[in-house]
A protein has these predicted regions:
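Residues forming the flavin
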Residues: 1-29, 33, 37-51, 55-188
Length: 188
């Protein structure tokens, strides 16, 4: 989120960490993820919403027709989620880029991840990280990572349909749309 704020506040674009990449990218600043519960027979969306609440989101998002967390609250919620992942033994590496993936036959014609190769963006150092499980939260614009996975023989499947865009508005416009004549009032 730090680099995303850097773009918005200082107009400094970090091409490797911005509104589309990293923590704070790939849709963090959008409530679309809160509405994605259509055709959800296993109620996974509800479980995800509960994770948001457990991390500090307002409990009303569990029952409101149009749930909204708010940008400033959402940043803290995502930071709390990161801390929980780390507490549970997960590892999150900022300022690192995936540059290689080590796969080995799993015995059933499938492949198993054995290691990741990452490069530190601050000094260029390359690290090999042994692992058997990986979660890559890529967003939609990590073309270099998709190419790397494809070239390594990792099975990839496109979503059936996806369209999106981001329209940015001054906060004062959003406040007026949401709060009407009360926009700008200190308690709001």
């Amino acid at each position: 989120t730090k680099d995303t704020w850097g773009l918005w506040r200082k107009k400094q674009l970090n091409p490797q960490s911005n509104v589309q990449y990293g923590e704070g990218g790939a849709g963090l600043f959008s409530d679309g993820k809160l509405y994605s519960q259509i055709k959800d027979p296993r109620f996974i969306g509800r479980k995800v919403m509960q994770e948001f609440v457990d991390a500090g989101a307002p409990p009303e998002i569990l029952y409101q027709a149009h749930p909204h967390i708010g940008t400033f609250k959402l940043v803290k919620v995502v930071e709390a989620m990161r801390e929980k992942i780390i507490e549970l033994g997960g590892e999150i590496r900022f300022q690192h880029q995936l540059v290689g993936i080590g796969l080995a036959p799993a015995g059933d014609g499938q492949q198993q991840v054995q290691a990741l190769r990452v490069q530190r963006l601050d000094n260029g150092e390359t690290l090999d990280l042994p692992t058997r499980r990986v979660v890559l939260a890529l967003g939609h614009s990590s073309r270099d990572t998709f190419a790397l996975l494809h070239d390594a023989g990792v099975y990839l499947e496109a979503k059936p349909f996806s369209v999106g865009f981001r329209a940015e508005h001054p906060q004062s416009v959003i406040d007026r749309a949401r709060w009407g004549k009360h926009a700008g009032h200190p308690p709001v």
